[in-house]
């Protein structure tokens, strides 16, 4: 009890303390609250001189304002102005004005704080820093300029300036002629000015780069950066941090006053040269004012789509470091026309000096000024100016030449990170790094002398020259035909994508650069004039091989290499696989015998990627290749970017050297002896002939056994190649209509390519049935058209008046056979190529067209092979093929061969498809599809032909043939198709008549070229195919075969070699776009993009598109983005904000264009939006995450990706409009644009009477109603109450009702039936009464006592019904009745019954006419 009282007293005491001094408690709470938001100074603030001492006096003011903020409570929904100011409805006008002023001060202070940190300290403020400086600015304690002064005097700002100045000096390494150094800075112009920050912000920090060199070489190290603080950017005599770069920008513009003609497609014509000079002299004035300008070159003239004027495709070369990298990052991947940018003032976008539109506006403005001043000879259309592409060329530092090696030493690009590409694996056709064998690119002051060619020499090591084939370090260029060079300023971007070709381009004599021909001396003198050797091999990769003339004395050969522009050597994979094949006389080894374990790896479409720096250590006994003075880096894609902001192109193709070695052997005996049902024709139909196969001999090691004789060596090669590899040959053609016989004996090859993945092995090729299996039909293999079949950068070469002549000298055992095959592609005005094709080829050489013959031979005592392939330099790149038909005709002649060298010397047939004098890299692929004409042929012998696509551009690289343990052959054929005439022209060949002692042979035709084109379609596809002979030996593919093509699968037709050309389609490939689109569809008009704003909070109101918050934010982004996009994108029409999503704020938008846009518009939009992110951060306090940018073209994008659909909704795309919308799943609703939510949550009273709401998948919301012992609720919403007694009563009532209804129905039916019976009985009784009364009436009215007329009339009146039953007339009935009645009364002896019977008969007589007729006949018979 005492304890209980003590507790009560204690509670009273505590209550009294609380109620007695509430003010003190409130004061303490208030003090605690006010103390919490006081700004705290960090350590950095006291250490920095930029902090003012006035901060200590602000506590009172800040506390009061914080208290007021905490006490304010908004009761009603505020009014949101478009500017962002929110006004409460109960505020007065003065308060609203004060709120605007307060909001203005807040925005100005925000901008000031962001800008001062970004400008002086180049970083974002921390949270405490931001709040501190914001409070200073809002209270007016410190002005904007005072804040800038404090920041400019801080130590952090000074160290930042020192660091960036040191970077700038090392990066520039030049004079200050193009920069404003010292003195008072002047305002920069829109076109050619930049700031120090722009120039230095993109310069990476210096790196120390070590260059791996073989023994005897030298290595250079980059000196450390000079950290001296100096405002001068002066020339430093030091090695630059990174190689000097050049920018090559390609433009196109239309000359309005000119008319396009065919002469402008030939660079050698006078009109082409005159127009080029006029154009260069006029356009040169535009670019001379730009910093770093070097020269201008005209690439080509073409006819625009509008057929008005002449479109000029030209390239401008700049010094890459003269203009900031940020400028070229914006321009690089953007191709747009000039737009009016007058509304984009510098005050709205102060940080963007070089934008795409500014650069183009500058050029267009000068063109317009020149046109107004009438200082022009050509009328250029500034509105047609279009930027095509940007290439960057790097110049590595000079080094001493190294030796040939299988693994090249690569200069490290200082801006590459080792881990840049570690997160990505290349696809089957992509590599990530592009480094090409060096060539001394054309410079304005370059000359064609030996000093310049020293850098390109490739010298073998002296110790490796242990074979009889001697090599010279340098071959003299004795004639014009020796020179193979590139045009001025040519970057090898195109050659990176084209594999090693069987031929090299030949440029005019006035080209400034050259490539040396390294060859071995030959015993014959015929080759000395040209500087070429029969041991010459095609240039490609470090490992190359040749076949010696005589048996070697040792096991090793060292083959000479030629630096050719067709080499694209990327990261070389070193494998541990030993590949040896026993062969004689055609065996090539590389390095010493001790190093035979290391071999080349055959790269098939994909390259195993090596991240930078690519340091490959030389192997003892091998030769090293030194990469000369340049490395090429294409603009690329993906997430890998180097320091200059340029991604590296994933389109580099490593190729191996391949030589075509004709080998002759008789056909297998099984063809002649066994049953030949598998062949298209019987053996008796096959004339005698030889099988001509080009063995693909590539970078592989073959064991040489000198003990075997020559015949055994040839036999071993023949046996191995026939037994374990598929035969790959090129088709030979003739002008005569002699059938081309296909070999039906397939052979297999077992591949051993060392690769991570080989997608082409699984799905890229399907072997035709007639190669792997012996049916007689020739089916078209369906090929997938994925990204692994696309060539990212291809060059197209048109063909006009070209001649391809191939001389093949064949020899077998004791008899020598020479077969000269000439391919010609002619214009219609020329005569058809007939039997004089070889002489015509010689005439082409005698003209003023420089020609180079590239010879590759493999000679032996009895077996010699030779092939001559050359190039003309007459056509220009991407020249459109004429629409007239051309012919592909051949001529085959046979003669006795006296010697291999004399045969080749007598035949000057080396003309091939022409290469232009000025060839420039381009992203455009030109294709010409040819209509197929099928002509039925009735040959004298059995005929069969295979549609073989015609190649009109040199774009083939053969990766040769390797063996492992003498049994396995690995044959790869890689082909890069730049310009393909998809003409299924049948190549027919004569079967050569041979002496009778030679066995009959057939010609094996194998096509490794796959073309894919749509005839008549505006869009075409170019495939880059690496053909694995384990999967395919012959492929002739058409995506949509015509009727002729389909019929070829069933019957062997012969296609004529006369094809008609159709319209050529040009495809501009993107440089940052992954080629995952199989076709090139019609270009879309819609581009989707999304971006994330990180400094804005998301609210639920932003889901509702009708809410003021949504409309205000939508209007704000439209005002920001639309002018920016209009100024930088051609044809921009409108921008639509699709929605806002949570995640800070994710803005999903869709822009539309007024006309089709280039395929790489997504890259341009990405770069523009990235620049917008930077601008918005600087000027509008919008922190946009650049890494969240997502841009997709409407034709490839998934519209659902940009819809804010949650897990309770499904995105559906309208089939017709392509619009996507979120449709809620059954049981879910979207209210006011909010994400779909459950009906159970949105409608709490969905289920009544305590029912439970549940979502059934696929059915929607259902209610689970309550159930009791003898009651329950039912209905869709549990609205009906049901009890057990009620159910029983309802059941009883239902049964009773049913019985009642049934009884009623039965009663009604019985009543009805009874009535019917009663009625029928009544009718019968009435009928009998009528008959009796009629007799009485007849007796009563006896006509005997009346006159006839009276009697008749009475009788007739008393029986009127008789007339209704009689079918005769009334008179006839009356007569019969009167006669009968008279007869009855005259014979009175009849009884009463008889009289009644007679009366009935009379009635029947009167009623039924048939009965009356029967009675008459009966009476007549009785009479």
From Swiss-Prot:
Region (Hyaluronan-binding motif involved in chondroitin sulfate C-binding): 1266-1274, 1322-1327
Cytoplasmic side: 1311-1423
Record: glycosylation sites: 150, 325, 375, 676, 1128, 1142, 1160
EGF-like domain residues: 1196-1234, 1237-1279
SUPFAM superfamilies: SEA domain
Domain of life: Eukaryota
Membrane topology: Single-pass type I membrane protein
Biased composition (Basic and acidic residues): 577-587
Cystine pairings recorded for this chain: 1200-1211, 1205-1222, 1240-1253, 1247-1263, 1265-1278
Stretches with biased composition (Polar residues): 889-902
Gene Ontology MF term list: heparin binding; hyaluronic acid binding
Keywords: Cell projection, Disulfide bond, EGF-like domain, Extracellular matrix, Glycoprotein, Heparin-binding, Membrane, Repeat, Secreted, Signal, Transmembrane, Transmembrane helix
Transmembrane segments: 1290-1310
Modification after translation (UniProt): Highly glycosylated (N- and O-linked carbohydrates).
Designated name of the protein: Interphotoreceptor matrix proteoglycan 2
Gene that produces this protein: IMPG2
């Amino acid at each position: 009890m005492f304890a209980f009282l003590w507790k009560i007293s204690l509670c009273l005491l505590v209550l009294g303390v609380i109620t007695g001094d509430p003010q003190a408690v409130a004061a303490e709470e208030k003090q605690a609250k006010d103390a919490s938001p006081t700004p705290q100074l960090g350590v950095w603030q006291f250490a920095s001189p930029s902090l003012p001492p006035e901060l200590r006096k602000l506590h009172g003011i800040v506390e009061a304002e914080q208290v007021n903020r905490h006490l304010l409570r908004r009761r009603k929904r505020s009014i949101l102005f478009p500017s962002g100011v929110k006004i409460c409805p109960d505020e007065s006008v003065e308060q609203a004005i004060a709120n605007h002023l307060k909001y203005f001060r807040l925005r100005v202070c925000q901008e000031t704080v962001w800008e001062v940190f970004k400008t002086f300290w180049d970083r974002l403020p921390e949270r405490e820093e931001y709040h501190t400086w914001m409070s200073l600015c809002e209270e007016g304690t410190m002005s904007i300029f005072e804040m800038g002064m404090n920041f400019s005097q801080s130590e952090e700002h000074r160290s930042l300036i020192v660091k960036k100045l040191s970077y700038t000096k090392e990066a520039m390494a030049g004079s200050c002629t193009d920069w404003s150094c010292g003195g008072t800075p002047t305002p920069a112009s829109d076109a050619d000015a930049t700031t120090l920050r722009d120039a230095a912000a993109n310069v990476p920090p210096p790196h120390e780069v070590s260059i791996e060199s073989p023994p005897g070489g030298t290595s250079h190290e980059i000196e450390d950066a000079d950290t001296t603080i100096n405002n001068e950017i002066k020339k430093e005599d030091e090695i630059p941090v990174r190689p000097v770069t050049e920018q090559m920008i390609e433009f196109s513009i239309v000359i309005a006053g000119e008319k396009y003609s065919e002469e402008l497609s030939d660079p050698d014509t006078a009109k082409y040269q005159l127009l080029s000079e006029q154009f260069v002299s006029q356009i040169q004035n535009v670019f001379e004012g730009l910093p770093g300008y070097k020269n201008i070159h005209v690439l080509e003239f073409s006819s625009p789509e509008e057929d008005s004027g002449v479109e000029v495709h030209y390239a401008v070369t700049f010094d890459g470091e003269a203009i900031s990298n940020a400028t070229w990052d914006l321009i690089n991947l953007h191709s747009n026309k000039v737009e009016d940018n007058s509304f984009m003032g510098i005050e709205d976008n102060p940080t963007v000096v070089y934008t795409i539109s500014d650069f183009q506006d500058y050029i267009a403005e000068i063109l317009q000024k020149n046109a107004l001043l009438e200082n022009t000879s050509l009328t250029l259309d500034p509105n047609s100016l279009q930027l095509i592409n940007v290439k960057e060329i790097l110049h590595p530092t000079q080094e001493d030449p190294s030796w040939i090696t299988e693994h090249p030493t690569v200069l490290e690009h200082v801006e590459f990170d080792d881990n840049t590409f570690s997160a990505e694996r290349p696809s089957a056709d992509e590599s990530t790094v592009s480094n090409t064998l060096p060539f001394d690119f054309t410079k304005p002051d370059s000359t064609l002398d030996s000093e310049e060619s020293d850098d390109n020499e490739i010298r073998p090591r002296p110790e490796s020259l242990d074979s009889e084939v001697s090599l010279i370090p340098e071959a003299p260029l004795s004639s014009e035909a020796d020179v193979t060079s590139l045009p001025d300023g040519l970057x090898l971007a195109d050659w990176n994508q084209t594999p090693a070709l069987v031929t090299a381009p030949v440029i005019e004599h006035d080209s400034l650069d050259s490539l040396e021909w390294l060859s071995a001396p030959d015993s014959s003198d015929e080759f000395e004039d040209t500087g070429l050797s029969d041991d010459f091999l095609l240039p490609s990769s470090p490992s190359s091989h040749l076949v010696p003339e005589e048996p070697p004395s040792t096991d090793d050969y060292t083959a000479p290499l030629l630096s050719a522009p067709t080499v694209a050597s990327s990261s070389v994979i070193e494998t541990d696989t030993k590949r040896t094949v026993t062969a004689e006389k055609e065996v090539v080894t590389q390095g010493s015998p001790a190093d035979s374990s290391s071999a080349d790896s055959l790269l098939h479409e994909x390259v195993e990627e090596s991240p930078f720096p690519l340091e490959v250590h030389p192997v003892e006994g091998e030769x090293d290749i030194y990469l000369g003075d340049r490395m090429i880096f294409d603009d690329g894609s993906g997430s890998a970017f180097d320091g200059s902001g340029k991604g590296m192109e994933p389109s580099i193709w490593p190729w191996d050297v391949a030589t075509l070695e004709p080998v002759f052997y008789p056909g297998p005996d099984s063809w002649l002896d066994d049953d030949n049902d598998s062949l298209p024709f019987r053996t008796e139909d096959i004339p005698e002939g030889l099988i001509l196969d080009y063995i693909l001999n590539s970078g592989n090691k073959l064991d040489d056994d000198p003990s075997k004789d020559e015949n055994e060596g040839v036999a071993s090669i023949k046996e191995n190649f026939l037994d374990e590899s598929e035969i790959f040959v090129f088709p030979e053609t003739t002008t005569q209509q002699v059938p081309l016989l296909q070999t039906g004996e397939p052979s297999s090859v077992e591949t051993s390519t060392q690769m991570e993945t080989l997608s082409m092995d699984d799905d890229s090729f399907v072997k035709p049935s007639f190669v792997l299996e012996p049916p007689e039909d020739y089916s078209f293999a369906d090929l997938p058209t994925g990204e692994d079949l696309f060539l990212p950068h291809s060059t197209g070469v048109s063909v006009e008046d070209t001649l391809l002549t191939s001389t093949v000298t064949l020899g077998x055992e004791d008899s020598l056979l020479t077969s000269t095959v000439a391919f010609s592609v002619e214009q219609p005005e020329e005569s058809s190529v007939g039997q004089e094709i070889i002489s015509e080829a010689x005439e082409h050489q005698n003209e003023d067209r420089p020609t180079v013959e590239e010879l590759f031979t493999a000679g032996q005592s009895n077996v010699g092979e030779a092939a001559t392939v050359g190039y003309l330099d007459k056509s220009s790149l991407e020249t459109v093929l004429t629409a007239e038909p051309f012919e592909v005709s051949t001529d085959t002649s046979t003669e006795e061969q006296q010697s291999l060298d004399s045969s080749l010397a007598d035949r000057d047939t080396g003309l091939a498809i022409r290469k232009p004098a000025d060839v420039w890299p381009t992203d455009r692929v030109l294709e010409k599809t040819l209509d197929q004409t099928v002509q039925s042929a009735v040959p004298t012998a059995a005929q069969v032909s295979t549609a073989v696509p015609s190649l009109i551009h040199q774009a083939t690289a053969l990766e040769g043939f390797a063996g492992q343990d003498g049994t396995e052959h690995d044959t790869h054929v890689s082909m890069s198709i730049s310009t393909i005439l998809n003409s299924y022209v049948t190549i027919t060949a004569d079967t050569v008549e041979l002496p009778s002692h030679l066995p009959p042979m057939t010609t094996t035709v194998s096509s490794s070229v796959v073309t894919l084109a749509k005839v008549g379609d505006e869009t075409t596809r170019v495939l880059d195919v690496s053909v694995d002979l384990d999967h395919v030996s012959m492929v002739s593919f058409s995506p949509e075969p015509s009727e002729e093509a389909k019929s070829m699968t069933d019957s062997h037709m012969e296609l004529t070699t006369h094809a008609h050309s159709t319209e050529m389609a040009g495809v501009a490939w993107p440089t940052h776009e992954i080629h995952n689109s199989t076709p090139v569809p019609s270009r879309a008009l819609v581009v989707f993009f999304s971006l994330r704003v990180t400094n804005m909070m998301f609210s639920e109101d932003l889901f509702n598109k009708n809410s003021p918050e949504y409309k205000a934010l939508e209007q704000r982004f439209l005002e920001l983005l639309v002018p920016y996009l209009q100024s930088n994108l051609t044809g921009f029409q409108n921008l639509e904000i699709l929605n806002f999503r949570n995640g800070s704020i994710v803005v999903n938008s869709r822009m539309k264009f007024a006309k089709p846009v280039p395929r790489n518009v997504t890259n341009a939009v990405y770069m523009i939006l990235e620049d917008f992110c930077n601008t918005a951060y600087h000027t509008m306090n919008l922190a946009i995450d650049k890494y969240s940018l997502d841009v997709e073209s409407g034709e490839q994008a998934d519209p659902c990706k940009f819809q804010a659909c949650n897990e309770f909704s499904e995105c559906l795309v309208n089939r017709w409009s392509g619009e996507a919308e979120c449709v809620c799943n059954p049981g879910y609703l979207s209210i006011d644009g909010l994400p779909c939510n459950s009906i159970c949550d949105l409608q709490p009273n969905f289920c009544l009477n305590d029912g439970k709401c549940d979502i059934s998948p696929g059915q929607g919301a259902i209610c689970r109603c309550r159930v009791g012992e003898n009651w329950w609720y039912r209905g869709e919403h549990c609205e009906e109450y049901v009890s057990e007694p009620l159910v029983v009563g309802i059941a009883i009532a239902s049964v009773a009702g049913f019985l009642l209804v049934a009884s009623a129905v039965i009663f009604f039916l019985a009543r009805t039936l009874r009535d019917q019976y009663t009625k029928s009985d009544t009718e019968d009784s009435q009928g009998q009464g009528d008959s009796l009364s009629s007799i009485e009436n007849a007796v009563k009215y006896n006509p005997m006592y009346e006159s006839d007329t009276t009697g008749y009339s009475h009788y007739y009146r008393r029986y009127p019904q008789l007339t209704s039953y009689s079918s005769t007339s009334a008179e006839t009935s009356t007569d019969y009745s009167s006669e009968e009645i008279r007869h009855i009364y005259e014979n009175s002896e009849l009884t009463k019954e008889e009289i009644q019977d007679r009366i009935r008969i009379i009635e029947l007589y009167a009623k039924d006419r048939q009965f009356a007729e029967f009675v008459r006949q009966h009476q007549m018979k009785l009479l």
